[in-house]
A protein has these predicted regions:
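Structural core segment of the AMP-binding/adenylate-forming
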Residues: 52-53, 83-142
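Conserved AMP-binding/adenylate-forming core of the ANL superfamily
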Residues: 2, 6, 11, 15, ...
Length: 142
């Protein structure tokens, strides 16, 4: 059977896989292993977080994180909430990320703490501080 007819949507595929494959291993991220059922629950929590933060169908939700279990859950959760996904390159500096966030009008950002020795949160705060002081970030003012 064609997947698009069976599941209809990506969220439908996630729910179907959680039901169909349950405790079968779905994702391995370092030492962390999760089943399809666990992945489905993570996706539902991320979707609920989007909705609780005011995300509506068609809103943009950004993710600034490396490929990981958390990225998968956040991305599928955002899509499940009806959002348009805005993935940010992990090599971006704070100003570049701030520029993409502003241009995309992202309503919500899923962000990792630190990756490759860089604190993404601190990087964004520095960019916001420069913009508040009248400076610019890559691509223009924020």
């Amino acid at each position: 059977m064609r997947g698009d007819l069976e599941w209809g949507t990506i969220p439908g595929l996630v729910r179907s896989a959680a039901r169909r494959y349950g405790e079968v291993e779905a994702v391995v991220d370092g030492r962390t292993r999760v089943s399809y059922a666990e992945l489905g629950a993570r996706v539902e929590r991320a979707a609920a977080a989007c909705v609780a933060n005011g995300v509506r169908v068609g809103d943009r939700v950004a993710i600034w994180a490396p490929n990981s279990l958390d990225w998968i859950g956040a991305a599928l959760g955002a899509v499940s909430a009806g959002a348009v996904l805005v993935p940010l390159n992990t090599r971006f500096k704070g100003g570049e990320a701030a520029d993409v966030l502003a241009r995309s009008r992202a309503k919500l950002l899923f962000i990792t703490g630190t990756f490759l020795g860089t604190s993404y949160v601190a990087s964004l705060r520095r960019a916001a501080g420069r913009a508040a002081a009248g400076g610019t970030v890559a691509g223009g003012a924020v």
